[in-house]
Amino acid sequence: MAQPGSGCKATTRCLEGTAPPAMAQSDAEALAGALDKDEGQASPCTPSTPSVCSPPSAASSVPSAGKNICSSCGLEILDRYLLKVNNLIWHVRCLECSVCRTSLRQQNSCYIKNKEIFCKMDYFSRFGTKCARCGRQIYASDWVRRARGNAYHLACFACFSCKRQLSTGEEFGLVEEKVLCRIHYDTMIENLKRAAENGNGLTLEGAVPSEQDSQPKPAKRARTSFTAEQLQVMQAQFAQDNNPDAQTLQKLADMTGLSRRVIQVWFQNCRARHKKHTPQHPVPPSGAPPSRLPSALSDDIHYTPFSSPERARMVTLHGYIESQVQCGQVHCRLPYTAPPVHLKADMDGPLSNRGEKVILFQY
C-alpha cells in the first residue's frame, strides 16, 4: 500500500474567536490535510483537534495583516470559516476532490499528492497497492503474498499454467510477473534447452507452458449403469416391442427416471446385439403381416413352459442378453443370472420338437 507522503489531517478551524467545542477527528492513513487556525503562521502537519468558531466580538476583532486567498477560486476568503490543507487555504465550498469533484466539506479526511486533492476512494484507487496478477486494488484487510516486490491476492498467487494455488513455503518461479509452480517452471527450462539444442529461437514468454498445454486430456465418458428396477421395465418393454415409438420412450423415461436418449440407445444396442446372435430365418409370405419381434423370440414368449405364479416374474430372453451386457456405450448389468435350463425332448409343447436351449434370466 502506498506510504504516507506530505500531508496531514484535515480539520476545520475559525480565523479568530474563543475556543469552540470539539468536532469529530478524521482518520487518514497517508497524505491527509490539516485545517488550522489562520494566524499568519503555518502549523506543522500533525493531527490537530478540530474546532468550531464562535462569533467574534467587536472588541476582540483584530484586522488581519494579509488577505486569505482561496487556492481554488483565487478569491479572498471573507467567510467565517476556511479550510487549510498543507499550508494552503480554501473556501469551505471550494475544497473538492480533483477526480470526482465531490465536495470534501462533510468528509473527515482528504489526501493531497502533487498539490492535487483527492477523496479517500480516488486516492487509493490511483495510488494504492494493486495485485500484480488481476490488477485490482488490495485493501488493508486483504491477505496478500509478496514476491520480488509484487503483491498478490491469495487466490491470485497461483500457477499460470495449471491454475493451482500455491501454499506457504512451496517453491515457485516468477517469469515476467507470471507465477509458475515447480513442475511447470522446470518444463519451461526444458523448453528453452530443447530450443537451444535445435537452434530454434524461443523467447522466455514462449517457453512458458500455456493454459491449453496444462489442461489434462478429457477422460472417457462414464458408462451408464442401470438399477434392477430400470432393467426390469426396459426388458419387459423390449419383450413386447423392441422398437418403441417416442410416446413409449417418454413413458419409460418417466417410469425409470432416465432420459429418453439413454433409453433409446439401450434399445438400439440391444436390437443390434439380438440381431447378431439370432440365426437367419426364411422370409414370411408377403400376405402375412410383418412381426416386430423375431419368430424365435415370439415362440419362446408364447409357449414358455413356466406358467406358475412364482415363475411368472421370469422373462424368457434368448441369447441376445447375457449376465453382463456390453451394449455399445450403455453398460447393462443384471442383478442375477439363472443357470441355463436345458429342455428335454420329451417335454410337451412346440419347443420339445425343436430341441433348442433356452436361457432364462431372473431379474
UniProtKB/Swiss-Prot annotation:
Disulfide bonds: none annotated. Residues 70-122, 131-184 form the LIM zinc-binding domain. It is found in: Nucleus. It comes from the Eukaryota. This is LIM/homeobox protein Lhx6. Residues 55-194 are annotated as: Required for interaction with LDB1. SMART domains: HOX, LIM. Signal peptide: none annotated. GO terms for molecular function: DNA-binding transcription factor activity; DNA-binding transcription factor activity, RNA polymerase II-specific; metal ion binding; RNA polymerase II transcription regulatory region sequence-specific DNA binding; sequence-specific double-stranded DNA binding. Residues 219-278 bind DNA. Residues 42-53 have a biased composition (Low complexity). Interacts with LDB1 (via the LIM zinc-binding domains).
